[in-house]
Curated annotation (Swiss-Prot):
It holds the Pfam family Mur_ligase. InterPro entries: Mur-like_cat_sf, Mur_ligase_C, Mur_ligase_C_dom_sf, Mur_ligase_cen, Mur_ligase_N, MurCDEF_pg_biosynth, UDP-N-AcMur_Ala_ligase_MurC. Its main location: cytoplasm. Its EC number is 6.3.2.8. This is UDP-N-acetylmuramate--L-alanine ligase. SUPFAM superfamilies: MurCD N-terminal domain (SSF51984), MurD-like peptide ligases, catalytic domain (SSF53623), MurD-like peptide ligases, peptide-binding domain (SSF53244).
Length: 447
């Protein structure tokens, strides 16, 4: 029996794909760096072996699935090629895997992971569904009819897919190390659209997506009157958001989600539209929307005393803006403190003023050093260039997170696509020490 070996198994997509193959009964293993990543927890729970990168890991009989971050010169891939083993890139393997299902590719500059998670939750509760989510979660469900997958636009990798449906959440200029302009991004999305078999669900409030020209139906959703599926009468509460949905100006139903911000209404609306198109019962869809608990690293809340710590993947000005607004909806009486770690020097340089403008929507801003991606380790700017444009000109270090104790009633947003979680972990240790010290003082006073 073939053993699938994943080169870079801790990558979010790779981890999810490994879990899918494991669930389908295949033997799976993989390798990566020794550093801990949140994606490996699910792998460990399923007892999928994780090794440290080494050419010695590559033996006869393996089929190699290579992560897109690793070139053919990587020691394990080189050894595999020397042995004449089959080496296939992640996105190409996934493109082959989804054939035979009613596949739904969820793409967009922002909101892919949250929407894929929501769709998987809703459709999966109604019909057997396999799914691959960009937070490292994957499931190869037995006898699945549907396959929901997050489709990343970077380097046009999503062009390896020919899905039944696509959901396009928005188009924005991101990944400036690859895409040269928003027009370049649009061209990639339109090319994907031409590969979709049945229909594309697209945000009609997005000027770029309105330019799509395809031979299949484009079902537009959004807040605007011109959309086929429209969200109206939005009520924002501290417990979530309620809204009505109209289909071609006819009332469909009222919905409720335990999530915050306009972006989450739109994510839910895309799922509602697809489910309606597929004839899934609206009452079932309503019930499942109410129970979605979110995906990893997307507004993930930890309460510590009177402080609320939020872990979020936001790494683009538009995403930061959405996260700050969501925090203000859920916690209207709390101060919002942003702790942000920029991801890649190219993105930071390109959107420097945009980052400053969105971060300054928070009450206080703290910046971590720029996180260089695997493709880009250094740059000719520093975090000070961004700090000069933000409130307070604060730069925070992992070993000095106690500065955040100054905001005892605040919501603290730890945002970034790198390893900003280590700053939150360091601060939680500070808080735990503070709570212990306070408890000791009270105990001494009683005695």
């Amino acid at each position: 029996m073939t053993i699938y070996h994943f080169v870079g198994i801790k990558g979010s997509g790779m981890s999810a794909l490994a879990q899918i193959l494991h669930d389908k009964g295949f033997q799976v293993q993989g390798s990566d760096v020794d550093k801990y990543f949140f994606t490996q927890k699910a792998l460990e729970e399923k007892q999928i072996p994780i090794m440290t990168f080494s050419a010695d890991n590559i033996q006869e009989g393996l089929t190699i699935i290579a992560g897109n971050a690793f070139p053919d010169t990587h020691e394990e891939i080189e050894r595999a090629l020397e042995l004449g083993l089959s080496v296939i890139r992640y996105h190409k393997f996934l493109g082959q895997l989804i054939d035979g299902y009613t596949s739904i590719a969820i793409t967009g500059s922002h909101g892919k992971t949250s929407t894929t998670g929501l769709l998987s939750h809703v459709v999966g509760a109604i019909r057997p569904t396999s799914y691959l989510i960009g937070d490292g979660t994957g499931s190869g469900t037995k006898d699945a009819e549907y396959f929901a997958l997050e489709a990343c636009e970077y380097q046009r990798h999503f062009l390896a897919y020919k899905p039944t449906y696509a959901i396009m959440t928005n188009i924005d200029w991101d990944h400036p190390d690859y895409f040269k302009s928003v027009d370049d991004v649009f061209n990639a999305f339109e090319t994907l659209g031409k590969q979709v078999k049945k229909a594309v669900f697209a945000l009609g409030d997005d000027a770029e997506l309105r330019k799509l020209t395809l031979d299949i139906p484009i079902i537009y959703f959004g807040f605007g009157e011109e959309n086929e599926f429209q969200a109206k009468n939005v009520i924002k509460e501290t417990t979530g958001t309620k809204f009505d949905v109209y289909h071609r100006e006819e009332f469909l139903s009222s919905f409720e989600i335990p999530a915050y911000g306009d972006h989450n209404v739109l994510n839910a609306l895309s799922v509602i539209a697809l489910c309606d198109y597929e004839g899934l019962p609206v009452e079932d869809v309503k019930n499942e929307l109410k129970t979605f608990e979110g995906v990893k690293r997307r507004f993930s809340i930890t309460e510590k005393g009177n402080q609320v710590l939020v872990d979020d993947y936001a790494h683009h000005p538009s995403e930061i803006r959405a996260t700050v607004n969501a925090a203000r909806q859920k916690y209207p009486d709390k101060k919002v403190v942003a702790v942000f770690q920029p991801h890649t020097f190219t993105r930071t340089r390109t959107f420097l003023q945009g980052f400053a403008d969105s971060l300054n929507l928070a009450d206080e801003v703290y910046l971590c050093d720029i996180f260089g991606s695997a493709r880009e380790k250094t740059g000719n700017l520093t975090i000070a260039d961004l700090a000069h444009k933000t409130k307070g000109n604060h730069i925070i270090k992992e070993e000095h997170t106690e500065e955040l104790l100054k905001y005892p009633e605040a919501v603290i947003l730890f945002m970034g696509a790198g390893d900003v979680q280590k700053f939150q972990a360091a601060y939680e240790k500070v808080l735990d020490h503070e709570f212990l010290t306070e408890a000791d003082l009270k105990k001494s006073a009683i005695n």
